[in-house]
């Protein structure tokens, strides 16, 4: 817990540490055929970086902060069931949906060109 960053990607904010992997619903900047294994990614939307006891916050993002990582694989999340029923009409509809997600690993966090 000595260093971590809070990033914004895929419509959500994540607390990321180097060497750990995370699931994200979708990368806006990548097309589906670019989501292959070991594709290197750079995330520039870094909201905050903590290194030991110092905290640097952006407004809204930190300038010169980059989170480098690579894609491990694409996967599907757990299936949810949608059930619609209209009473007194004998109308029932049951649907399922699985959200596509991408698993990536964070390799390093950079601030102003230096790895923290």
UniProtKB/Swiss-Prot annotation:
Keywords: Chloroplast, Plastid, Ribonucleoprotein, Ribosomal protein, RNA-binding, rRNA-binding
Disulfide cysteine pairs (residue numbers): none
One Pfam family cited in the UniProt record for this chain: Ribosomal_L21p
Name of protein: Large ribosomal subunit protein bL21c
Function: This protein binds to 23S rRNA.
Gene this chain is encoded by: rpl21
Coiled-coil region: none
Quaternary structure note: Part of the 50S ribosomal subunit.
Keyword Ribosomal protein: yes
GO CC annotation: chloroplast; ribonucleoprotein complex; ribosome
SUPFAM superfamilies xref list: L21p-like
Principal subcellular localisation of the protein: plastid
Compartments in which it is found: Plastid, Chloroplast
Gene Ontology biological-process entries: translation
Keyword presence, Ribonucleoprotein: yes
UniProt family annotation: Belongs to the bacterial ribosomal protein bL21 family.
One annotated GO molecular function: rRNA binding
């Amino acid at each position: 817990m000595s260093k971590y960053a809070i990033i914004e990607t895929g419509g959500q904010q994540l607390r990321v540490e180097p060497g750990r992997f995370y699931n994200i619903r979708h990368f806006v900047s990548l097309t589906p055929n670019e989501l292959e294994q070991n594709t290197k990614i750079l995330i520039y939307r870094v909201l905050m970086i903590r290194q030991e006891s110092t905290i640097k916050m952006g407004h809204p993002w930190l300038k010169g902060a980059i989170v480098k990582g690579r894609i491990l694989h694409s996967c599907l999340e757990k299936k949810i069931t949608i059930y619609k029923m209209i009473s007194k009409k004998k109308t029932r509809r049951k649907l399922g949906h699985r959200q596509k997600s991408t698993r990536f690993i964070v390799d390093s966090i950079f601030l102003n060109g230096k790895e923290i």
